[in-house]
Amino acid sequence: MRAWLLGVGLSLLAPLLAAQVSLPHDEYLPADPFGQRQDKPEQVLFEVQRYSLTVGSELRPGGRPNQAEAGVWLLLEGRSLLAGSPVERARLHFVEGGAGLRAARLEDDANTLVITYPLSLLPVIRQQLDAPGADYVQRRFYGNGLIWADLHSAPQSGAR
């Protein structure tokens, strides 16, 4: 009888144990149709309080004048919403087309999150940051190698 109860209990618990882990700001992630987000990820989450835009170019020593590189970056700074998380900055790097998109990563002794976006998204992101309401940066690294990063805004009430 005891073994039967244990078996029934485990069969009832199994779906709950396999369910997706709930974390702050889950509602901003897209659906997970392939079930890749099952474990509890390392999460970075902070509210953006200010930002700055940098447009720069660089010619490396010994390079020819036509080999200069240019770039656009937004530096977002704010306040962490997770206890113990030192990450309160994100550098959004914009690249032409989709070339050179890299997974979100931590730099500068793990205090700055770097996210790469296509340059075509810069106007949309600037508009989002300039709109009223709170904005947040989020990154999640799952044990299976899945990496999610985003910039999202708090829900807004629509003007009618």
Question: Model-predicted segments: where are they?
Answer:
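Positively charged n-region of N-terminal signal peptides that target proteins for export
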Residues: 1-3
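N-terminal signal peptide c-region/cleavage motif recognized by signal peptidases
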Residues: 13-16
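OB-fold ssDNA-binding interfaces and closely related basic DNA-contact patches used
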Residues: 19-87, 92
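Short beta-strand/loop turn elements enriched in aromatics
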Residues: 84-108
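Acidic, glycine-rich flexible loop segments
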Residues: 99-155
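Short, solvent-exposed mixed-charge patches
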Residues: 158-160
